[in-house]
Amino acid sequence: MITYTRTANAGGILEMDGVRILLDGVSQAVNDYLATPPDLLNTLYDTHLDMIAFTHNHSDHFQPEFVRSYVKHHPLPKLIGPKDVAADLSDYAVITASSSVGAVQLIAVPSRHMGAEYTDTPHYSFLIRGSSLDWFMGDASPPQWKGQDHFPHPDVLIAPYAYASTEAAWEITEQITQGKILLTHLPDKERDSAQLWPAVEKVLDQHDRFRVRIPRMGDVCEVY
């Protein structure tokens, strides 16, 4: 069984083949986007992690203070992220490329961040290959994958709301995978000033919603 537990705005713990990977798993509140709640943060401090991976250096995805506190009480996990993540964790050996633990391989895919203002932001998405193939997008922009047939089609796609907020984006999402989809990076419905929830629900109502899940904070999803 492979599980994903949401612990942050756009990330969480992926547990596959006995390996635990924290993916963008601790966040600070930014605008309507959610911070990691204190109870989940305490749980993370008590959890053995084999890898900690960050897609990019934005505070709703990356909290270097968590790493510094975590390693005071645990052996140093493998740390993976782009160059500006490595710069903010310069006391540790951050891997700025692909890596593996046991039978699980994490493949760093250079990706373009959503939004024209973030064109120069170093950003990875992560392919996680073990007994299933999962793709964790972080904040990777959907249009960059259009027509990119050389990428494998994952069994599970973990992606931000933008992959289902318009019909054009959903068409790309369906080209990426016919497997399960976990949508992240959505605020609480009660604090959704950008009206992201209505946009996503409008698209999903027109398509095969049964394979899409939008986990709440702390939800454990059996993904494979």
Question: Can you say where each PLM-predicted feature lies in the sequence?
Answer:
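Active-site HxH/HxHxD metal-binding segment of metal-dependent hydrolases
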Residues: 40-99
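Active-site-proximal loop/helix segments of hydrolase catalytic cores
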Residues: 113-175
